[in-house]
Amino acid sequence: MSSNFKIEYINENNYNRIFVTSDIHGYYNLFEKLLNKINLQKDDLLIILGDSCDRGENSIELYLKYIELQEQGYQVKHIWGNHEDMLYESAFISFYYKDLWYKVGGDETVYNYEQYIKKNYWKG
């Protein structure tokens, strides 16, 4: 388990509305529907309680969308869930976690990253 632990105080008075969601699991289209449904504004806060990767086909696109929204001035906070933790552990700590991670959808995330790299960076 990663050891980067941080408690952050959020003053709800600093935002017009606060939305909380979780377990998007690579389903980019569902996230887009959520954004359209709530009509996210720059004075709102969107908190994503992790598990943005695995299972669905667009994990990397979700993370890139979060970054894009932040760069555009939207208030988006993403908290690591157990799937992000398994991704990190299997990639950087121990192969023990790789089998477990693949069983819960990590194989889809690896495939998604491979396809993204081939599409955007592969010149061969």
What does each model-identified segment do?
Residues 1-65:
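N-terminal active-site segment of His-dependent metallophosphoesterases
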Residues 55-124:
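Active-site neighborhood of divalent metal-dependent phosphoester bond hydrolases
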